[in-house]
Swiss-Prot record:
PANTHER family: ASPARTATE CARBAMOYLTRANSFERASE, ORNITHINE CARBAMOYLTRANSFERASE, MITOCHONDRIAL. InterPro entries: Asp/Orn_carbamoyltranf_P-bd, Asp/Orn_carbamoylTrfase, Asp/Orn_carbamoylTrfase_sf, Asp_carbamoyltransf, Asp_carbamoyltransf_Asp/Orn-bd. It comes from Frankia alni (strain DSM 45986 / CECT 9034 / ACN14a). One of its GO terms (molecular function) is amino acid binding. It catalyses: carbamoyl phosphate + L-aspartate = N-carbamoyl-L-aspartate + phosphate + H(+). GO terms for biological process: 'de novo' pyrimidine nucleobase biosynthetic process; 'de novo' UMP biosynthetic process; amino acid metabolic process. This is Aspartate carbamoyltransferase catalytic subunit. Coiled coil: none annotated.
């Protein structure tokens, strides 16, 4: 990872593929840089010349609106040239392999490739085939590191710290790359994490994660500083993981009554997209506790920071 002053740092090593690779110093550098980037959004001219002449390719093999748009806005605010590459209707849909696509990107001279793929590990393979930096924008059920970074950034903005916070992640942990990235990053930053889910929606290896496991949401909420609700990812399911949606919502949904048991300062987070009425009630999602809209805005600042640090952006960010 390239620091603000150009010094080489450990952790990302030219790429951002997993939060598990980040040291505490790496993570704090991204969050601190994102704070400076956030001030750019408040300026009269919301643009920096730091990546002028650089090319960032958004390579998305899965449909995405918010993440792709967020990376596009981030790169453009740093004055980079942006190429959006969608697998649908492209050579990929005609049978081109990921390696063939990588060779095409290499020929284009891409300085950074932001990759989302349905296969876990695809960005890691891509990073071995291209000379530019690779940013994992979500790979299968594996990781989504910039989402975890923006979540931590949001916690720090609202609560002043991440170290020492009690964070509860609720829902479809089994299929959630967001949960995995958050678990590793939050542990690195000193938070304590509890995951709450039906046994069928917990991964087999969860016992090796730095988390507590609970099946009782009501018992955990009163001791929680941040509760992060996850969507049930039916598109990744080939069988029934719980009896009915109504039963799931009754046991693991955050309704108004449950939210009232949270400490007064506690936050409600959701990486989106939300299924209102299932994992979260509309009144809770739209309440003052909710950071859903802030998370979207903060995503641009965090992704600006990641691109700036990976590509060794020129000039100071005040």
């Amino acid at each position: 990872m390239v620091g603000v002053g150009g010094e080489r740092r450990s952790g990302m090593k030219g790429h951002l593929l997993s939060t598990e690779d980040l040291s505490r110093d790496d993570a704090l550098l991204v969050l601190d840089t994102a704070e400076r980037m956030a001030r750019v959004a408040e300026a009269s001219v919301r643009k920096l010349p730091t990546l002028r002449g650089r090319t960032v390719v958004n390579l998305f093999f899965e449909d995405s609106t918010r993440t792709r748009t967020s990376f596009e806005v981030a790169a453009k605010r740093l004055s980079a040239d942006v190429i959006n590459f969608s697998a649908r209707g492209s050579s990929v849909s005609k049978g081109e392999s990921l390696k063939d696509t990588a060779q095409t990107l290499e020929a284009m001279g891409a300085d950074a490739v932001v990759c989302r793929h349905s296969a876990s590990g695809a960005p890691h393979r891509l990073a071995t085939w291209v000379r530019g930096s690779v940013v994992n924008a979500g790979d299968g059920t594996h990781e989504h590191p910039t989402q975890a970074l923006l979540d931590a950034f949001t916690m720090r903005q609202r609560l002043g710290r991440v170290d020492g916070l009690a964070v509860t992640i609720v829902g479809d942990v089994l299929h959630s790359r967001v949960a995995r990235s958050n678990v590793w990053l939050l542990a690195t930053l000193g938070a304590s994490v509890t995951v709450v889910a039906p046994p069928t929606l917990l991964p087999i290896g969860v016992s090796s994660w730095p988390v507590e496991v609970s099946y009782d949401l009501d018992a955990v909420l009163p001791k929680t500083d941040v509760v992060m609700m996850l969507r049930v990812q039916r598109e990744r399911m080939s069988a029934a993981f719980f009896p009915t949606e109504r039963e799931y919502s009754r046991r693991y949904g955050l309704d108004v009554d449950r939210a009232a048991t949270l400490p007064e300062h506690a936050l409600v987070m959701h990486p989106g997209p939300m299924v209102r009425g299932m994992e979260i009630a509309s009144r809770v999602a739209d309440s003052d506790r909710s950071t859903v809209v802030e998370q979207v805005a903060n995503g641009v600042s965090v992704r600006m920071a990641v691109l700036y640090l990976l590509l060794g952006g020129s000039g100071e960010v005040s």
